[in-house]
A protein has these predicted regions:
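Active/ligand-binding-proximal structured segments within catalytic/core domains
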Residues: 3, 15-34
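M16 family metallopeptidases and their MPP-like homologs
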Residues: 1-18, 38-163, 175
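Divalent metal-coordination and catalytic microenvironments
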Residues: 28, 87, 166
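Amphipathic heptad-repeat coiled-coil/leucine-zipper-like oligomerization helices
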Residues: 169-173
């Protein structure tokens, strides 16, 4: 199952700036928190799905000017309706109440650890990772500061983004 919440995407000329890095950071935070919530549901008795995730896709299908906050799940056999209900309920809970400061802090730490790992492994980076970064830059207006600069900037950004800004972003996406 897929649920798409279509939205305008950040214009390419802004996506190439620090605004693009901030947007990507907040997207990663939102996806991380939603994925953690879905994982909690998976650990309850009789979850309706086998797998669920949420993410923001800057290219909704083939539309270059639209993005989509996407909530997806692999339903258990005979559980499509309850899976859909669970996804919608969880999304509506986020829309109504947002994320908690403790959820944000856990996600912030996890995202920063991922960047730290990429930074520490920068000398072992495979060529295809560079290719993807450059293709994204030219096709979607992404930024290419390199992991050293990205890691430094992200550590500064993460300290200055409050949970309220993250909540405003996700509410704008699923509005």
């Amino acid at each position: 199952l897929y649920i798409f919440y279509k939205h305008d995407k950040l214009p390419n000329d802004l996506n190439r700036t620090i605004a693009g890095l901030v947007k990507d950071y907040i997207q990663q935070i939102c996806a991380s928190i939603m994925d953690e919530r879905f994982d909690d549901i998976l650990h309850q008795a009789n979850p309706p799905f086998i797998y669920a995730q949420a993410y923001d896709d800057d290219n909704f299908m083939i539309a270059k000017s639209k993005g989509a906050w996407t909530v997806a799940a692999l339903a258990k056999e005979g559980e499509i309706d309850s899976t859909l209900t669970t996804l919608v309920k969880e999304t509506q809970r986020v829309k109504q109440y947002g994320f908690t400061p403790s959820e944000y802090e856990r996600a912030r730490i996890n995202v920063l650890k991922q960047y730290e790992s990429a930074y520490n492994e920068r000398n072992n980076q495979k060529n295809d990772a560079y290719v993807r970064e450059y293709v994204n830059h030219f096709t979607n207006g992404g930024y290419i500061p390199g992991i050293e600069m990205e890691y430094t900037l992200l550590n500064q950004i993460a300290q200055n983004i409050p949970v309220e800004q993250v909540n405003q972003y996700i509410q704008d996406m699923i509005g």
